[in-house]
Amino acid sequence: METTTTTTTAAATKGTNDAMETSSSTTATPTTATVVPQVVRNDEYINTFYDIANKLDTNPSFPDDDKLFSKIIELSSKTKQTKKLSPQFISKYFKRFPTLQEKAIDCLIDLFDSSDEDVIMRVNALKAIPTICRDNPDHIAKLVDILSQLLNTDSKVEAEHTKNSLIELYKLNSVTTLNSFLTFLESEESSMEDQPASSTLLSFLKESIIPLVRTEYSKSSIETQTFFRVRILKLIAKCTSTTELDLLFQLLECFTQYKVQETITDLETNVLPVIESQSLDTIRKKLINFTKILLFKSKKPHTEINSNKLFDLYLNKIFPKVNELDETNKTELVSVFSQVTPHMTQEISMQFLEPVYNLFKATVPSKTTTPVADVDLQFTIVEALLFALSSIGSKSTSSLCKLCGFKLVTGQPSDMNADPVKYEDFLGRHRFLDEKCRETLGKAKKAIPNLGNPKDKAQLKLAQKTLLSTQNILTIMQNLLKSPPVTNINNLVISSTIFKGKQNLIHNVSPVFKPQQHQHQHQQQQVQQKQYQKYQAQQQQQQNIPIQRNQQQQQQQKSNRYQPYVTPGRRHQDLDKPKQDGVEVHYYSEKHNKPSSFKGRGPKSY
């Protein structure tokens, strides 16, 4: 049967060619003579594809069947039609020929890299990738690396199908896919901003992959989380691009199952030695994020963060050059550092006492030398510095008093060691802060009631933050001027706190720092609630009156119904009987002035 079919097809082809030659000799141009054989040739390649498919589908396994699959790979680059159809046949029989899989993947890669303008051809090749990896996950790592480079394309359709293929690969094997993404980022040595392919990949990871990772790995095994955390930390140590750093820290936040001491060990081993030689801005950004990571696992007040290398970077790299930072970066740095001071050990915290106080003096001038109106203070920075100063001073009050010139009256000879010059200098800065904060506090209180419009939400938030920071500054300064200084800040929440729960407490719940209009609204709500409760009680009482009357009538009927009849003479005889020991008590009601029916429980002996 096969021989007959082949002969018939050849004859038909020959007849067609003869007819074409006859027509070309009479009317056809040379252009027509070159087009027609190409159409026939395309039909031959397509028919060959389907003939091979029929043979492979008919027999699951037979000798030399790999030659047929090799023929499919060979024909894939012949014409445009075969380029469009070959991914379909390659993906269908890919699993059946493991020895030819590498060759088939190279064929698909050639279709990706083809300079042909036909987008459909490349889209078909992209669609075949998840299919061939569904039963062969060993090729995922290689294909993820290749597809990551193809994201930077001018065709939106092609870029969208590339993203879909990467997402499908992630769903097939998330561990291998995510590890391949990290390997791709690790291979990039230069800045991500200078390489469009890497920038496109970072954007794709942020929009599509990180939400999937956050959902899947929130409750994964500790071993898996540790593996990825170590990999990401090593990438962070080498990275200098702001865009890549933001992405890596977002990815690091997806793996939340870790302990403080384990993280400190990883930082001191793999990260901190590498970043010492980097720029000030890079060190600042990394230190802030590392400090936040440690703080989120150290929410308890007495949890210590014992990392000498981490705080050495603050002491030697950051504080000497902190004034070189712009206002926004300086505010963020000082705020985060102040929140970690309660978790420092006493040995580490004493190293920061003088640098923090010197930075405070450089930020806040003295009233004796500078008019209040001439200085525009950054209250968030001042609040954070005072918070850090109180926190560090609580670990050694004597060191704080010696630094600021406070005089402690203890009856000991050391009372005479106070430095009056230092104390007067501190008092001058206190007077400056007191006047400046009270002036700003009054402005904030007046502004908040007028910011009820939803459009003024940002201004309202800023006014609330200013109100809180000025109140905190006044509270801390007043406590420091007491004898002895009060340095307890456990119940104090600074305006720049990194904990979202405490931020909500500041703006919505906290009665200490709530604006006046919120207090007034709260009082009105309480009054309305009491009135409503009183109204409900009255309604309930009115509903119970008929029920009580009915119960009284029923009780009276029962008492009359079962009480035996006693003649009047018998009743007087009972009253005239000699009384036994005890006292007879008569109860009279206030309304009717009649004896009550209550007779007590037996004779009473008084």
Swiss-Prot record:
Positions with biased composition (Low complexity): 1-13, 537-564
Would the keyword Magnesium turn up in this protein's UniProt record? Answer: no
The cross-references to SUPFAM superfamilies, in alphabetical order and at most eight, read:
ARM repeat
Q: Where is this region: Disordered?
A: 1-30, 537-606
Q: Which GO terms describe its biological process?
A: negative regulation of apoptotic process
Q: What are the protein's UniProt keywords? A: Apoptosis
Tell me the Gene3D superfamilies matching this sequence: Leucine-rich Repeat Variant (1.25.10.10)
Biased amino acid composition, Basic and acidic residues: 571-593
Q: Identify the Pfam families for this entry.
A: API5 (PF05918)
**Entry GO terms, CC:** nucleus
Gene Ontology molecular function terms on file: RNA binding
Explain the purpose of this protein: May be an antiapoptotic factor.
Family listed: Belongs to the API5 family.
- PANTHER family assigned to the protein according to its UniProt record, in alphabetical order: APOPTOSIS INHIBITOR 5 (PTHR12758:SF19), APOPTOSIS INHIBITOR 5-RELATED (PTHR12758)
Name of the protein in its database record:
Apoptosis inhibitor 5 homolog
Name the gene: api5
